[in-house]
């Protein structure tokens, strides 16, 4: 198809931009074969921290798990890698904004049960997520059968905590660089300890308390450097008693946090016990999982989407005949990737669950047809942006974990029984003119 039609991956038409992150940009798209709406993620092929190939393989490994988006395509278009997945609704962070920066106990308990189930599914596939945050949990599309299902997305930081075949757990290690989002990461992660299932659970607990309280005690801390800021956040987490953190809320949230923080490094969590805690919260409220989340009760019961209808109408008018997407256009509804900040956005091969040697063949390094790419993007090195609500923001090159060069990682061959590769072959020419600039950094305050 011609470049003027904005078609990638043979039959995916690119629409408006709906988000961005340290990897690149996300666009809404349409499968021209069945008119299905999809999300199309772009990242520069020569990025310092390419992740879409690994993310594709993770989606394939998790295929069939409840609350995991379907993945449809991975391939290359000109100067970019692209990944096509299900188009979903807004993130829990977006919905928190709409609900006045706090959720009710009922909503948090219902959301917690779903979020915990998603993390359990990831753990059962021998993976740890390592970047738990509200921005990475999205609800389904409005008016769909799964509109109230909570999905987990963005698997750029996942890692095997055990061999998927032998089930042997990775060894305990220290002196690890931080990986994840400082606001929510576990205390052990701050202390440089290898992450395992317990750390995902503790980070989830921090998210639950963030939803209930509206903020966490370690937000808004200032320091001269990012490193010092992360240290201050870790110190504040350690010095804040759990009773104080959970004060004013049902006892079950304290029990959850106490359980997560006292798990052994290689212990298998009792997910049923944790699910039972939130079931007890709902029982005490004399309610059930009726899917009446706070965001569905907005605007006299019309729901969150009614608050966006005016903006959506404007967007539809602008995109009735969509031109080539432009980076400066923004979606008012889906900014989940624009509001996230990972402490580590670049990983060495041994930190990647499906690591393989970088391709150096002529076909991989060859420049695409410049006739089809009149405006190639400018390549820039990845940086990490750490703003806070006071307006302070600092940029610095994203740190690289250098402490695990001898770590034995799980290879791609070890999971061939779990998933089969169906990646699209590389194309020598792009179907359309490149419309992206290399995005670097993101902007979650810690």
Swiss-Prot record:
Region named Disordered: 308-430
Modification Phosphoserine occurs at: 329
Swiss-Prot/TrEMBL catalytic activity: L-seryl-[protein] + ATP = O-phospho-L-seryl-[protein] + ADP + H(+); L-threonyl-[protein] + ATP = O-phospho-L-threonyl-[protein] + ADP + H(+)
Any Pfam family the entry gives: Pkinase
Domain of life of the native organism: Eukaryota
Binding residue positions for ATP: 18-26, 41
Protein name according to UniProt: Casein kinase I homolog 1
Record flagged with keyword Glycoprotein: no
Entry's Gene Ontology cellular component terms: cytoplasm; fungal-type vacuole; nucleus
Residues in Protein kinase domain copies: 12-274
Enzyme Commission code: 2.7.11.1
Polar residues bias locations: 332-345, 360-397
BP GO terms, sorted: endocytosis; regulation of endocytosis; signal transduction
Coiled coil: none
Family per similarity comment: Belongs to the protein kinase superfamily. CK1 Ser/Thr protein kinase family. Casein kinase I subfamily.
Family matches, as InterPro entries: CK1_Ser-Thr_kinase, Kinase-like_dom_sf, Prot_kinase_dom, Protein_kinase_ATP_BS, Ser/Thr_kinase_AS
Main location: cytoplasm
Intracellular or extracellular location(s): Cytoplasm
Compositionally biased intervals (Basic and acidic residues): 346-355, 401-412
Signal peptide segment: none
Gene Ontology MF terms: ATP binding; magnesium ion binding; protein serine kinase activity; protein serine/threonine kinase activity; protein tyrosine kinase activity
């Amino acid at each position: 198809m011609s470049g003027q039609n904005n078609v990638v991956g043979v039959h995916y038409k690119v629409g408006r931009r709906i988000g961005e992150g340290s990897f690149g940009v996300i666009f809404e798209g349409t499968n021209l074969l069945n008119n299905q709406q999809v999300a199309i993620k772009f990242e520069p092929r020569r990025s310092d921290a390419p992740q879409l190939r690994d993310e594709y393989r993770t989606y394939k490994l998790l295929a069939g798990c409840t609350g995991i988006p379907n993945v449809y395509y991975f391939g290359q278009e000109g100067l970019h890698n692209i990944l096509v997945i299900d188009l979903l609704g807004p993130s829990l962070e977006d919905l928190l904004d709409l609900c006045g920066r706090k959720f009710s106990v009922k909503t948090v308990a219902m959301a917690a049960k779903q979020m915990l189930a998603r993390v359990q599914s990831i753990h059962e596939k021998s993976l740890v997520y390592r970047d738990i945050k509200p921005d990475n949990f999205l609800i389904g599309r409005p008016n769909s059968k799964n509109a109230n299902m909570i999905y987990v997305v963005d698997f750029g930081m996942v890692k095997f905590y055990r061999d998927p075949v032998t089930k042997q757990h990775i060894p305990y290690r220290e002196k690890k660089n931080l990986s994840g989002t400082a606001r929510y990461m576990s205390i052990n992660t701050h202390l440089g300890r290898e992450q395992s299932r317990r750390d995902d659970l503790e980070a989830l607990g921090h998210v639950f308390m963030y939803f209930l309280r509206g903020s966490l005690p370690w937000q808004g801390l200032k320091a001269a450097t990012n490193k010092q800021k992360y240290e201050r956040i870790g110190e504040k987490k350690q010095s804040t008693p759990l009773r104080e953190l959970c004060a004013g809320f049902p006892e079950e949230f304290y029990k959850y946090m106490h359980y997560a923080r006292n798990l052994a490094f290689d212990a298998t969590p009792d997910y049923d016990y944790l699910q039972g805690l939130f079931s007890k919260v709902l029982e005490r409220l004399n309610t059930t999982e009726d899917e009446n989340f706070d965001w569905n009760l907005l605007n006299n019961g019309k729901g969150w989407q009614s608050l966006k209808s005016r903006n959506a109408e404007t967007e539809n008018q602008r995109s009735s005949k969509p031109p080539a997407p432009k980076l400066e256009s923004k979606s008012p509804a889906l900014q989940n990737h624009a509001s996230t900040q990972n402490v580590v956005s670049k990983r060495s091969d041994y930190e990647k669950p499906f690591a393989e040697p970088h391709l150096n063949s002529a076909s991989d390094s060859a420049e695409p047809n410049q006739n089809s790419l009149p405006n190639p993007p400018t390549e820039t090195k990845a940086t990490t942006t750490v703003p806070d609500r006071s307006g302070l923001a600092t940029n610095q090159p994203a740190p690289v974990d250098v402490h695990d060069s001898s770590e034995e990682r799980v290879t791609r061959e070890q999971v061939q029984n779990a998933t089969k590769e169906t990646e699209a072959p590389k194309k020598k020419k792009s179907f359309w003119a490149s419309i992206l600039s290399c995005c670097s950094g993101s902007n979650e305050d810690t």
